């Protein structure tokens, strides 16, 4: 069973990832969920997937967290992304947070030897060489999950199935 931390779980890509987990519970277990501010949606996800850690990057007082979701560790602020990316034992970290915050999350995950599933182009635009060097150092490629990024990634591979995607020079 693969464990996954989902940073940005209440957004479009995060909810799609959770749908895959829902369809394949024997293959995946969610260990961390984070969101920016969609707390009600995050509370619902925590109830269903029962992660070890949950967090909001826009902090709220613990008194505003419902009793029935306090079974997991709650982390607030930027620390939520770091804890979910690097502290919680996870095989994979899906980084689907918006903007430059994604770069630090990617670097934290790679620093903890995690497989990064990337849905944040800003991380590569602003720190591409840092990200790719870190991925190379741990021997794990960055796997794009956004549709456009994934299409480009697939076309740059030597082979997909039996068909070659690019000419060899």
Q: Over which residues does each language-model region extend?
A:
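Residue-level signal for inorganic ion chemistry
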Residues: 10, 46, 93, 113, ...
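Active-site-proximal loop->helix
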Residues: 16-23, 44-45, 126-139, 155-158
């Amino acid at each position: 069973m693969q464990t996954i931390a989902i940073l940005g779980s209440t957004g479009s890509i995060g909810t799609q990832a959770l749908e895959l987990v829902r369809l394949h519970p024997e293959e995946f277990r969610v260990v961390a969920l984070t969101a920016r501010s969609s707390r009600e949606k995050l509370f619902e996800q925590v109830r269903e997937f029962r992660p070890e850690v949950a967090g909001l990057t826009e902090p709220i007082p613990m008194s505003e967290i419902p009793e029935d979701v306090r079974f997991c560790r709650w982390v607030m602020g930027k620390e939520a992304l770091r804890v979910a990316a690097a502290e919680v034992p996870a095989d994979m970290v899906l980084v689907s947070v918006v903007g430059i915050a994604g770069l630090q999350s990617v670097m934290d995950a790679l620093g903890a030897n995690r497989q990064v599933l990337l849905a944040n182009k800003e991380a590569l635009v602003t720190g591409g060489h840092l990200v790719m060097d870190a991925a190379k150092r741990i021997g794990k490629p960055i796997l794009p999950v956004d549709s456009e990024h994934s299409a480009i990634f697939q076309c740059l591979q030597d082979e997909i199935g039996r068909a070659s995607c690019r000419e060899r020079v």
